[in-house]
């Protein structure tokens, strides 16, 4: 599946890993547009990357099921585990539950090792029929 990233994702320089993983992996490189305090990523950029990864995972899951829907994030909870440094940063999402009206998606953000996340997020998303 090819994802059309929204303008916000394009502004952050987010890319999609072309691998055939079950859930898309999104990434961005360290730059001035994602920097926070000297040498570290901005928390908002990390949150944005995880939100985009969660939405991509949910879109992928709904497409697999043949159930296209319009998505409206309702709540995003983020936990920062450690500071992100000046290197490529990745994120992916996992759909925990996708009902008829609501979906729950977890996202993880890492740099060197997916087993050592720099941040975790949980999104609640309203689903409505695609028009």
Regions picked out by a protein language model, each given a short descriptive name:
Residues 1-131:
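Terminal targeting signals and extreme-terminal segments of soluble enzymes
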């Amino acid at each position: 599946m090819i994802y059309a990233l929204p303008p916000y994702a394009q502004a952050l320089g987010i890319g999609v890993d072309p691998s055939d993983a079950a859930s898309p992996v999104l990434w961005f490189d360290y730059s001035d547009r994602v920097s926070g305090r000297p040498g570290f990523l901005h928390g908002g950029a990390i949150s944005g990357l995880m939100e985009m990864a969660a939405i991509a995972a949910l879109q992928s899951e709904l497409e697999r099921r043949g159930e296209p829907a319009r998505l409206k994030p309702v709540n995003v909870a983020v936990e920062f585990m450690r500071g992100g440094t000046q290197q490529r940063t990745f994120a992916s999402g996992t759909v925990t539950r996708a009902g008829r009206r609501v979906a729950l998606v977890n996202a993880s953000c890492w740099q060197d090792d997916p087993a050592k996340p720099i941040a975790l997020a949980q999104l609640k998303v309203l689903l409505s029929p695609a028009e």
